[in-house]
Amino acid sequence: MSRRLGAAAAVLLLWLAVLTFALHGYYGGRLGSARRRNILLQHPALALHLPTRKMLLAVASFDDASSPSSLTTTDRHHHHHRHHGHHHHRGHDRWNRKGVPPTAAGPGEEVDPRFGVQKRLVPTGPNPLHH
């Protein structure tokens, strides 16, 4: 009798795990989402293989790739790679591009030319938190 009870408990736990995955893992806990229903109607094969988040990403990327503006987005991202020989971006790594000299204010009153705010003193030396 106890062996039969153990088997019934195992089957019950297995069914609960399957139902939990089906309701929360697969659908993300939102069974009545209108967008999901529309996606499933347009692409029914996705419902059998992909979890909800991956399904939405796959459909969104498929829609983005098929849109006419996707080509201009790709061109914009790869614009810099066409001009490897040109060096018209030389000033990007300099912190003081405009050449503004530091002000002659006293210590602690100096204005940072990058951010336009007063510079703060940074403590130097050993870290007091390390023993």
From Swiss-Prot:
Residues 76-97 have a biased composition (Basic residues). Residues 67-131 are annotated as: Disordered. Expressed in all aerial apical meristems, including the floral and inflorescence meristems in the reproductive phase and the shoot apical meristem in the vegetative phase. Also detected in the primordia of lateral organs such as the leaf and the floral organs. It comes from the Eukaryota. One of its GO terms (biological process) is cell differentiation. InterPro entries: CLE9-13 (IPR039618). Keywords: Developmental protein, Differentiation. Belongs to the CLV3/ESR signal peptide family. Non functional suppressor of the fon2 mutation. In Oryza sativa subsp. japonica, the protein has a single amino acid substitution at the putative processing site of the signal peptide while in all the other varieties/species of domesticated and wild rice tested the protein is functional. This is Inactive protein FON2 SPARE1. It comes from Oryza sativa subsp. japonica (Rice).
